[in-house]
Amino acid sequence: RDLYYVAVHFHGTDQCDVSLADAFTEEEIKALWECDNAKYYMERGPGINPVYPSEQYGVYVLEDFIDRAVEDLAQDRPVVRLRFGHDGCMMVLYTVMGLPGWSDPAKDYSDIKNVWHNYNVPMASNVQMVFYRGRQPDDILVRLYINEKVQAMPFEPVGDCFYRWEDVLAGYTDVIKAG
């Protein structure tokens, strides 16, 4: 299994022209991915049991996001905060945030491969919450980007993946309190 892990991540380097993936059949790669994917689902995602071990980390990071956003929005000037993270940490955050594809429950272990795909998050990732102020002080919209791609959120959208900050703040405050 360790050779599989090296093989699937080795292609991201330009150090060697050899493919370690050639050591496996297509069926072996699929079976090993399903094991690896299930491991991440159980450890970093919603898991089969609704209480998963990494949840508190995701809640902590989400709380920090929300706290910093509240601070920044109180200022009367543009503010930028950059956030980067490793794939395993980001999976936990995406799950806690209830993002589509990261928080869907599996019916059983064999269903995990249908609702969770650990390869959808690169080893190095970034999250951006971009805020747009309207004419009124409390008229604020937010749009979420994951690795520079617009990401849907579990709230009622206003237009194409824009959300009212008051809805996002209330929803994620509830998640933080429950965590």
Q: Where in the sequence are the language-model features?
A:
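Signature for phosphate-centric chemistry
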Residues: 1-81, 85-179
